[in-house]
Curated annotation (Swiss-Prot):
Assembly behavior: Component of the Mediator complex.
Coiled coil: 231-307, 790-827
GO terms for cellular component: cytoplasm; nucleus
GO molecular function, one term: histone acetyltransferase activity
Protein name: Putative mediator of RNA polymerase II transcription subunit 15
Alphabetized UniProt keyword annotations: Activator, Coiled coil, Cytoplasm, Nucleus, Transcription, Transcription regulation
Species: Dictyostelium discoideum
Main location, first listed in the record: cytoplasm
Cell compartment(s), UniProt: Cytoplasm; Nucleus
Gene responsible for this protein: med15
Polar residues compositional bias, start-end: 145-154, 308-319, 359-368
GO biological process terms on file: transcription by RNA polymerase II
Function: Component of the Mediator complex, a coactivator involved in the regulated transcription of nearly all RNA polymerase II-dependent genes. Mediator functions as a bridge to convey information from gene-specific regulatory proteins to the basal RNA polymerase II transcription machinery. Mediator is recruited to promoters by direct interactions with regulatory proteins and serves as a scaffold for the assembly of a functional preinitiation complex with RNA polymerase II and the general transcription factors.
Family per similarity comment: Belongs to the Mediator complex subunit 15 family.
Region (Disordered): 79-212, 299-368
Length: 851
């Protein structure tokens, strides 16, 4: 925690507090700025000390999310306040949550109160009437349908609609004018009086106007009744949501907790706020009881009155319409009507249960009540499960939206330029991107039900594929490691099992050679990583021994014994096994020949067995633990574990016979030439063993001479695959090298000062297997070819070595002539003049010319 906190300066923290302050002052400009700054500082300090933050970026992201959440909550309040028609003015920041009141039914006592202020306009009434009429006309017959001549006139009955509109207007006025209770009551009374006058006028007009209409069929009556019940249910549900938001706001918030920590001057204000909250809770309880009474009254009225019928336009008379005749219902229609009444009664029971527990309802729980379309990806999931998965996917991908929006222009540009697409296709491609982004950026307040989980999943896959394909391999691995770091220990165990199972699946599609060359297979998804089997915890037989007592074994449909023992001959094809049997016979015979040959050689001790498959050969004089003893190991099977070698040095494989390994107690370069031999005869092996010991003694003497000069640092390199031995000599002091041009322009001091180059030069000498009878070869590091000064060094070294080789060839010719005259054998050979020390002398001579 302290590591990332130290990277944040006080100026940055103050800047974040000022951002929160400016955001709050935009909504509440009349509030005291000093007090708002205290609240902003407290909010920033709380985010800074949150235990879940692990980095500076996480802290900045939490600040941004908090500002975004504050903005959403304030916009929601603004949208709720916008439902009323009062002029919107910037309100001061509330110290306590404001609880709107639901308009009580108008009583004669309220109508007699004299008004104290100008009545507010009630133009919402006409709008609500039009909306209600439009809603009802959607399920009624068209006004242009033909009329029957014998249909009696029916009076237009709109009293229920007008009363509902008046109730809605009174509720809206009461919600907006909650802060001034006395004045608002007067205004409400005035509005109620005006509404009553309008209702009277409407009723008079309705009584004077009569129209002709068709009688409703039983099915239309059922549909009309269900529609009215649904509208009434929606109105009551909105009132319940408002009450729930009020009760939720009355609980202690972050701002109130900060005020509790202020000096004693604010304690009096807190007591007043608590009293106001208690009064508001009592008023809310009264309003809940009134809603229950209204529901019962409306239910009784619906049973008494007949369903309203839409009136065709253009037909009016002054006669009063008689009551329509009740047509008998069929048994099927009676069952439908009974089912509709039962569903309405069930909705009323659920609503009453919510009224009894209003505090349990919150705006966040409304997301669980949203209808969802059935998912083809999860056919057995319930509505609640689909709803939860929908919002979990939205929250998981929202953190990538800023990065995705940043790369959208680049992706669209590449799409238009690569294939020269038409502008219409490019716009369609761009619109698809933006639609998917908007689909993911939804909130519970902005989403349009029903929720479609399949559509959201397709959008998520499309955006994530485009986003991950735009990342480099390094960024992909960083995200993979980031997801691993964020997981807990328990999740990492499941994560490890998934990785091992994933690798086991890849072996079905990728060969072992491919996996060994590439080192593994990676996936672009941030939560999947396919890799080569690690040696730490690997349950497969081809891996090293597992360090845990109970290794993780991947489960499949059929049980597979991965660690069960099987004979080696079953793993080898028939042709290969026959070759292996022949080789084993040769090795067994060679082992016996070596033991018999050492018994007859006076310079060597008789070979003896260390274990069943290993023998040791030693010199008579220098034998022992410190000598150049030769260890020979014969593998009995083609798939055995590698031999570790002697106590001091590791084992080396024989190139021609991979089932034979050798090692020594002395320097490995003393027996290195034996790796390049063909091990078929014991006599040849013992002969080359003695020559390699002489070679090793000569190399050790020459290296001791070079070390005594104290001019070079020496490093030896043993190439076991190709059976070669290299020695690298590097100068200890830096040398000033000059090119040919610099040597010609030594009089010009400026050029010498600017172009001088100092180097620690190195030369790599390869010692042949039959040294000293073959000359030393040299090479330079490959980077020397890039420098012009070192190219001159290489060209001069080549000339000197050619001259030395010519001299060596001349000596060999003279030696051959002498051997022929003296009848010596052809196998006699003189040592070469180009030794390790002579090669270094040539190297120093060339350096003097360049320095």
């Amino acid at each position: 925690m302290t590591d990332w906190k130290t990277t944040i300066t006080p100026e940055e923290r103050n800047g974040n507090s000022i951002k929160i302050l400016d955001f709050l002052m935009q909504w509440y400009p009349n509030f005291n700025r000093a007090e708002a700054l205290v609240r902003a500082n407290t909010l920033e300090d709380r985010i800074f000390n949150t235990p879940g933050i692990i980095s500076k970026n996480d802290y900045i992201e939490r600040i941004a999310k908090k500002i975004y959440a504050i903005g959403e909550s304030l916009e929601a309040k603004k949208a709720q306040a916008g439902m009323t028609n009062n002029p919107q003015t910037p309100n001061p920041m509330p110290t306590t949550p404001i609880t709107p009141l639901i308009q009580q039914p108008i009583t004669p006592v309220q109508q007699q109160v004299p008004p104290q202020k100008q009545p507010q306009p009630v133009y919402n009434q006409q709008q609500n009437q039009q909306q209600n009429q439009n809603q009802y006309t959607t399920t009624y017959p068209s006004p242009n349908t033909p009329q029957q001549s014998n249909t009696p006139p029916i009076s237009n009955n709109n009293s229920n609609n007008n009363s509902n509109n008046n109730l809605n207007n009174n509720n809206n006025n009461n919600i907006n004018n909650n802060n001034n209770n006395n004045n608002n009551n007067n205004n409400n009374n005035n509005n109620n009086n005006n509404n009553n006058n309008n209702n009277n006028n409407n009723n008079n007009n309705n009584n004077n106007n009569t129209v002709y209409a068709q009688p409703l069929t039983p099915q239309q009556q059922i549909q009309q009744q269900q529609h009215q019940q649904h509208q009434l249910y929606l109105q009551q549900q909105q009132q319940l949501q408002r009450l729930a938001q009020q009760n939720q706001q009355q609980q202690p918030t972050i701002m109130q907790q900060v005020q509790n920590q202020q000096p004693t001057q604010q304690q009096q204000q807190q007591q007043q706020q608590q009293q106001q909250q208690q009064q508001q809770q009592q008023l809310n309880q009264q309003q809940i009881n009134q809603i229950k009474q209204q529901q019962q009254q409306q239910q009784q009225q619906q049973q008494q009155h007949q369903q309203p019928v839409q009136m065709p336009s253009g037909v009016t008379t002054n006669k009063q319409s008689p009551q329509p005749q009740n047509t008998p219902l069929t048994p099927q229609q009676q069952q439908q009507l009974l089912a509709a009444q039962q569903s309405h009664a069930q909705a009323q029971a659920n609503q009453n249960q919510q009224l009894q527990n209003p505090k349990r309802i919150s705006s966040t729980n409304n997301t669980h009540l949203m209808p969802c379309l059935p998912s083809t990806l999860y056919p057995t999931a319930t509505q609640q499960d689909i709803n939860n998965m929908y919002w979990e996917r939205v929250s998981s991908i929202k953190k990538y939206i800023p990065e995705i929006e940043a790369i959208i222009p680049k992706i669209i540009e590449n799409f238009s330029q690569s294939q020269n697409q038409q502008p219409q296709k490019v716009e369609t491609y761009k619109k698809k991107f933006l639609d998917f982004v908007q689909m993911v950026k939804v909130t519970p307040e902005t989403v349009v039900p029903p929720l479609n989980l399949d559509e959201l999943t397709n959008a998520e896959r499309y955006l994530m594929n485009m986003y991950l394909s735009s990342l480099s391999e390094e960024e992909q691995f960083k995200k993979i490691l980031g997801t691993i770091d964020d997981r807990s220990n328990d999740n990492l165990i499941h994560f490890e099992k998934d990785l091992l199972n994933a690798f086991e699946r890849t072996k079905r599609y990728f060969s072992d050679t491919f996996l060994n060359k590439t080192g593994g297979v990676t996936s672009k998804a941030p939560s999947i990583l396919w890799f080569k089997n690690p040696a730490l915890n690997n349950p497969f037989t081809s891996a090293t021994k597992c360090q845990f007592s109970d290794p993780i074994v991947p489960k499949k449909k059929q049980h597979i014994l991965l660690d069960s023992w099987t004979p080696e001959f079953k793993k080898i094809k028939k042709g290969n096994y026959e070759i292996f049997e022949k080789d084993q016979k040769i090795y067994n015979n060679l082992k016996k020949d070596l033991i018999d040959f050492t018994k007859n050689d006076n310079t060597l001790l008789p070979a003896k067995f260390i274990d069943k498959d290993t023998i040791i050969i030693s010199e008579t004089i220098n034998g022992g633990d410190g000598g150049n003893n030769l260890y020979i190991h014969f593998n009995q099977c083609q798939f055995s574990t590698s031999w570790k070698g002697s106590k001091k040095n590791p084992a080396m494989f024989v190139c021609s016979s991979p089932n034979i390994q050798i090692s020594s107690d002395g320097e490995l370069f003393s027996i290195q030439p034996l790796c390049g031999l063909s091990w078929d005869r014991a006599e040849i092996i013992i002969k080359h063993y003695k020559q390699s010991l002489n070679r090793g003694d000569l190399i050790s003497k020459e290296l001791s001479q070079v070390i005594s000069l104290n001019r070079y640092t020496i490093e030896s390199h043993l190439d076991l695959e190709n059976a070669k031995f290299f020695i690298q000599f590097s100068t200890k002091s830096t040398l000033l090298l000059k090119s040919k041009k610099q040597q010609q322009q030594q009089q010009d001091e400026k050029i010498n000062n600017n172009n001088n180059n100092f180097y620690n030069l190195s030369i790599l000498l390869e010692v042949p297997n039959n040294y000293p009878y073959s000359p030393i070869s040299y090479s330079f590091p490959p980077e020397y070819q890039l420098t012009p000064y070192l190219k001159d060094l290489e060209s001069k070294m080549n000339k000197e070595f050619e001259n030395s080789n010519d001299l060596n060839q001349l000596n060999n010719n003279i030696n051959n002539n002498n051997n022929n005259n003296n009848s010596f054998s052809d196998n006699t050979q003189l040592p070469t003049n180009q030794s390790i020390v002579e090669s270094l002398k040539i190297f120093e001579k060339v350096l003097k010319d360049l320095v």
